[in-house]
């Protein structure tokens, strides 16, 4: 195996005395893991920050072997670690990606979407310009893994207008008229998840994160809830304070 590709750093963990195992999302090969010799050195630690864009080369003699990985920094987002809200968002989105995707499965549109959300975070660290996109990324990831929510029509009546809720069991949208008697048992559906042109305020973002969080915990992160969802809760708490 020899793959040279752009990649987004998603996770790093120490391995051995000085090395690191890095997981990175690539446009054509999906999530790949590799061993970086000296990955915890002063030179490489700033390169292997989650969210950074690198030129990566994976090399392995057999398909079963963990590849060796060398990286060259293409674009650094490490400076955003000084912005608590932006850092929390990058931590969560990269953790979600690393924890959810199987290695070696192509997810080209997820790569493009993650890169776009990270760029939006970089240019608007206050979250006004990227919070809705982060929720949409969560929905896209769920859909790519076979857990798409059906937000196109009311599951009860077939109506396509005034969709206001989502069933926490089926993941189907519910219209306001059909859902109001059961509102306490349903999840609010913010308009920006139905109509991409709709405006969103902080309460809408919180509702969107509550919606995706329910299904991520139930369907995607079942075996990793304690670790991966801690990063998400830090982001939700920070955004909740803005609402």
Curated annotation (Swiss-Prot):
Matching Pfam families: RecO_C, RecO_N
Asked whether the keyword Lipoprotein is assigned, the reply is no
Source domain of life: Bacteria
State the GO CC annotations.
bacterial nucleoid
Q: Which family does it belong to?
A: Belongs to the RecO family.
Q: Name one GO biological process term.
A: DNA recombination
Source organism per entry reads Rhizorhabdus wittichii (strain DSM 6014 / CCUG 31198 / JCM 15750 / NBRC 105917 / EY 4224 / RW1) (Sphingomonas wittichii)
Instruction: Indicate what this protein is called per its UniProt record.
Output: DNA repair protein RecO
Give UniProt keywords alphabetically. DNA damage, DNA recombination, DNA repair
Summarizing the function annotation, the protein's role is:
Involved in DNA repair and RecF pathway recombination.
Q: Which PANTHER family does the entry link to?
A: DNA REPAIR PROTEIN RECO
């Amino acid at each position: 195996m020899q793959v040279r590709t752009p990649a987004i750093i998603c996770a790093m963990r120490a391995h051995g005395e000085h090395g690191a195992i890095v997981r990175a999302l690539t446009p054509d090969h999906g999530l790949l893991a590799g061993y970086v010799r000296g990955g915890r050195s002063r030179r490489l630690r700033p390169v292997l920050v989650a969210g950074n864009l690198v030129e990566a080369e994976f090399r392995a003699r057999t398909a079963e072997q963990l590849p060796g990985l060398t990286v060259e920094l293409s674009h650094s987002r490490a400076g955003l670690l000084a912005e608590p809200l932006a850092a929390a968002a990058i931590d969560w989105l990269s953790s979600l990606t690393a924890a959810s995707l199987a290695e070696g499965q192509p997810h080209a549109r997820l790569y493009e979407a993650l890169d776009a959300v990270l760029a939006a975070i970089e240019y608007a660290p206050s979250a006004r310009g990227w919070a809705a996109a982060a929720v949409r990324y969560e929905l896209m990831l769920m859909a790519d893994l076979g857990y798409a929510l059906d937000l196109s029509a009311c599951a009860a009546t077939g109506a396509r207008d005034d969709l206001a809720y989502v069933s926490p069991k089926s993941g189907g949208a519910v219209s306001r008229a059909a859902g109001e008697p059961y509102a306490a048992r349903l999840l609010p559906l913010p308009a920006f998840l139905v109509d991409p042109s709709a405006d969103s305020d902080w309460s809408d973002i919180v509702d969107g994160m509550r919606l995706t969080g329910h299904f991520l915990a139930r369907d995607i992160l079942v075996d990793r809830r304690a670790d991966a969802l801690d990063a998400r809760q830090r982001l939700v708490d920070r955004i909740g304070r803005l609402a």
